[in-house]
Amino acid sequence: MKQGIHPKYETLKVSCSCGHTFETRSTRSEDLHLDVCSECHPFYTGKQRVMDTGGRVDKFKKRFGALGKKDS
């Protein structure tokens, strides 16, 4: 590799709004703040919920249900 053309690779501190912090390496020089990380995101914590707010599935089936039916 050529010397002096690559950005400096530094250690930076990553912090989340939940309070979890960790260190990683990057060419970014300033610290990084995240809104959601693997410690607090529902997908990773197993607290994921599937919600049908306002009956959206039923509304969709009501509008487009007839399109999927086959004539015999």
Swiss-Prot record:
Binds 1 zinc ion per subunit. Pfam families: Ribosomal_L31. GO terms for molecular function: metal ion binding; rRNA binding; structural constituent of ribosome. The keyword Ribosomal protein applies. Zn(2+) binds at C16, C18, C37, C40. One of its GO terms (biological process) is translation. The keyword Zinc applies. InterPro entries: Ribosomal_bL28/bL31-like_sf, Ribosomal_bL31, Ribosomal_bL31_A, Ribosomal_bL31_sf. One of its GO terms (cellular component) is ribonucleoprotein complex. Its cofactor is Zn(2+). SUPFAM superfamilies: L28p-like. Keywords: Metal-binding, Ribonucleoprotein, Ribosomal protein, RNA-binding, rRNA-binding, Zinc. HAMAP family: Ribosomal_bL31_1. PANTHER family: 50S RIBOSOMAL PROTEIN L31, CHLOROPLASTIC (PTHR33280), LARGE RIBOSOMAL SUBUNIT PROTEIN BL31A (PTHR33280:SF6). Belongs to the bacterial ribosomal protein bL31 family. Type A subfamily. Binds the 23S rRNA. Part of the 50S ribosomal subunit. This is Large ribosomal subunit protein bL31. The lineage of its organism: Bacteria, Pseudomonadati, Pseudomonadota, Gammaproteobacteria, Alteromonadales. The gene is rpmE.
